[in-house]
Amino acid sequence: MTVQNLAAQSPFITKDGSTIRSILDRTNAPVQKQSLAEARVPAGGRTERHYHKVLEEFYFILEGAGEIELDGERRMVGPGDAILIPSGTWHTIKATEPLRFLCCCAPPYSHEDTYLE
């Protein structure tokens, strides 16, 4: 059985500029097909516009508000919103207030599959 606590995970900055704490991924669990992380973007901040060739992502907004952009389409998001980001989709999220969200990736997240504009 694998149980990880968010508070025990060290934060790091991803290639897109967000602050991440991996909850379950290949570095801390016997994960094969997906990963789960908490992401934070400060008010006024945004992730670098990017896409992933292989992985598909879900974002689930826990706190804050912002604007998600997927292939040029924009929408305001807030707590309780779940966002599907298909493989190959250019995306960025801008925080209009401090954002905290869960990010689930399948297959597991890797810097090598993140392509910046």
Model-derived features: positions:
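A short, N-terminal "cap"/entry segment at the start of jelly-roll beta-barrel domains
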Residues: 1-33, 48, 114-117
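A generic "binding-loop/recognition-motif" signal
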Residues: 43, 54, 73, 89, ...
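Glycine- and acidic-residue-biased ligand/ion/polar-headgroup-sensing regions
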Residues: 54-56, 60-66
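A cytosolic small-molecule/anion-sensing beta-strand core signal
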Residues: 62, 78-79, 97
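Ligand-binding loop in jelly-roll beta-barrel domains
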Residues: 87-112
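Short acidic-glycine-tyrosine-enriched beta hairpin
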Residues: 73-87
